[in-house]
């Protein structure tokens, strides 16, 4: 078998008949499979042992040779080679066909490759292949030309003969008529009798003339057809063809079926055809040119690849190894078999029958029918159902053909090659493990024992608990007490990987150090839940064990949970306190008055009556007061601190030279807040204030930016412990009694009900219409809901647990409290419109039957939406991964001078709109500017260089840029990166997950796809109704899909193609807009613009208004409401314009949902969408006009052409949707495993495509290490040099090398001496 590590590319091509015979070990001649009595394969059948190898290891079929000693011998009795039965997975056979057949992929695929090659319409081709029409394969032009006069004379003679016969017949008939009339005359017949005879004679004579005329016409047709006869001419009329064959068979050859096609292909001159097609392309126009271009693609593919086009017509077909199409016996003695065996059996039966008919010399019509059936059976074997009705098995189920085995989710690619199951894994339910450290997980003992079984067995033998592996295995299975101690050692410092499906981003798999626990559930650290999106309501997780030292090192260094605190999408920490922990820390840092519980012992000023109270000389003293019950946790106090750093302003004031540990300062704070600050690093400035979720996030973000990961991990762990501790002690729980109901709610609702009645009366009197009533009622009841809600909010005291949970940011929001205690308010129906009767009750009071019914519409739609969204989001992620999977950081710096211009800050204006000289951050700088390298010096407002080119922008640099008033910067971006495949580290910038410059080998494409796809489920499915807009404005997930697929939006808006003033003309149903360009060029007119869609709005000075006559518009500005078409944006604004448009539009959708994603992730996908260009003029290059090529390849080819004095290639930028871009990838393996498998493979085979194995998918498919991370080529040849201590420790193993390792008396006893490696040459 091939070793995947010994080849660098994989090529696919067309197999010729000789190739198929060379692969084969013998011909399958019989349709039989297994003898049902002996259960042995039939000789020459589909499972024949002589062809495919023995069914039992080292044993021939007849049993003459058994055992391995006869290896390689071929039995003279049964002809079976003595070898391993595994060869039945590799050895192929073949079927010699009695008549050639076409390969359905090349004939029936779209476009039909055979049709393009031979210039035949697919319909005509089908008629020929399936014996419904004849085709001329060759014509002897010279012979026809030289004999034409003779043949013409013969034809004229024949025509003359026909005419003479006609005349003779007519004369005879006329004579007979005269005689008949004379007889009647003599007999004195009446006139009508004579007339009858006359009419009959006339009719007969007319028939004679018509017959002769038809005969002459037929002869003319035969002659004209013969004179114009040309190769590839189809003759559908069977009798005409027979006549031609009778008369002129020496001058032409023809036929029907695949044989005729085979003859045409063999006579086909590819080079001459290519030349004539190029001529047509040069001189032709319109459809003719287009067809020539398409045909040239196919012809050039065969020329370039060296494939023999005859491979599209098969003389023999391969039979795949029997183990890949097995037949197994079921319990009842019946057999279950693969569908392929049925399909092969049909082919063999029909083939044998055809052979027999040919031997018997059967009539041509019967033979042709049998050939057609053979063709159909081969079609069904290759691709069942592609043409006509599929062949069905029992129960009318279509049989699975070879193509079906590759296609779809259950096909070979996605099911077996990209979705392998792995050993050393287990799964169980997860429960919370609050006592764990961030890098730990609790592993059930039984599961750990099974996972680490080989390691435990090895240790048991090493420690002499067991004599050999077999007894060690028995000990493990019986769970002897010694096993548990050994297991503890085996798992020490051996990380395991936990995974929760669905793995939406890379933090869905993380490594943890296992801690053995009782029970059968896996314990998960509470802070890891956010990344896994896990909760403890029955979720399950899988455990995987990294085996090799390299895998363990990767798991520990790269995947350990404590090293993966930041989100790769936005760079924000994910391991944050949540839920109970947030409530606990919020409670800890609250401040309470003296009279409240928890506020006792608060600070009071010194008076004449006595000294100040609530002042403490040290933290210890305050804690002692708290323990005695004198001081409350949340009471404001003054305390002297010397072990925590003071806030920045206190430090600046009291310690100008900087604070040192041990220096004291007085804090006005609470005991709880001091305890909170003790959880943070000692040199982090003291944090004062109530710590709700937002503030906690600010602190942790700050820590992540300024401290090493290990410190952050320890800090969040401490916060988790304190959070749980104080949440328990705060007594925050929810009971029915905590839900307070508004006492005067009924009165409020009665007021609004009266207003609603007034609106209904207005409708009845015709003062308002239906839509105005609807809008008025919706507004009224929304106002009522808000009023009730706000009243409820005021009703709750601060110490009520429900608002406490909401205010701390742990869970829920105020609107949920309104629903719980106020009123539910307006609900929607399944169409998304409001039901005008609101739900007036709260959940505390309970809903009435009608209210419950109304409410269930919207709830049901919500659930259905969620289900649809999950599937759609998953499919989007799959397409994104596919398009970006080969974007890997390949080099440190591509050296480009290009970059993108980004906004950093905006001037702050005063009330009069004048500049104040100060600057504020521009919107969204965190997701656009941070983490990038400067491509040019950043110049401040005063002209000084603030940051030089090549600086990476972090929080500090950003603050400097804003302070200096740098409004825009030019930064490096993946969209302008010069690296041919993948991107360079400098253009990508900092990795969001580490905060450092991205390393070479990082799979940034997949990280980008995951970052965009992972929040996809949170996006809404809804399309928004905007009043008066033609159709709906798409939003949420469908909008993201529309953008990435580069589709024309539903409510498409035209965009201004020039800068200029706008003139609006308004007729009944449409607008006509005219732009008068600033540069005085020709006016641009946009006609028939829908009024329903409405004019675009302009935002001026915070006020939005529609476009007006005389307004100035900029190039690229939308003229109507709706969305711009990306293809239009590309045409008007160019590549850079459309890139920015797509990024802004995608970000708009995510920002609406409050999801932070860095622009660079979207940039990577957009870069892949704009990678290809269309060749308009090929210049001096090899490209065909109209073909899609890689932009970087086109640039390289142009440079090469110009060097040699040629013309460069002329191209047009293209924007491709992600599905199309995935299928247009260089790698045919990756494209075939994505979608349209058969089409991709057909195309790849004709072009003899070579897969360079650059991306990730293609390497996974063939089983190689992926070329990313540590698997990239530059890291592959690293040698590890062990230290002497490591060598000694690693090799203290039982060994049989020479003396000295074992005592002389007890041979086989282990002495524990280390193996001297130097003598063995192992290093």
From Swiss-Prot:
GO terms for molecular function: DNA binding; DNA-directed RNA polymerase activity; magnesium ion binding; zinc ion binding. The keyword Transferase applies. One of its GO terms (cellular component) is DNA-directed RNA polymerase complex. SUPFAM superfamilies: beta and beta-prime subunits of DNA dependent RNA-polymerase (SSF64484). Its EC number is 2.7.7.6. Zn(2+) 2 binds at residues 894, 977, 984, 987. Binds 1 Mg(2+) ion per subunit. Binds 2 Zn(2+) ions per subunit. It is an enzyme of class 2 (transferase). One of its GO terms (biological process) is DNA-templated transcription. It catalyses: RNA(n) + a ribonucleoside 5'-triphosphate = RNA(n+1) + diphosphate. Signal peptide: none annotated. Its cofactor is Mg(2+); Zn(2+). Mg(2+) binds at residues 535, 537, 539. The RNAP catalytic core consists of 2 alpha, 1 beta, 1 beta' and 1 omega subunit. When a sigma factor is associated with the core the holoenzyme is formed, which can initiate transcription. DNA-dependent RNA polymerase catalyzes the transcription of DNA into RNA using the four ribonucleoside triphosphates as substrates. This is DNA-directed RNA polymerase subunit beta'. It comes from Corynebacterium urealyticum (strain ATCC 43042 / DSM 7109).
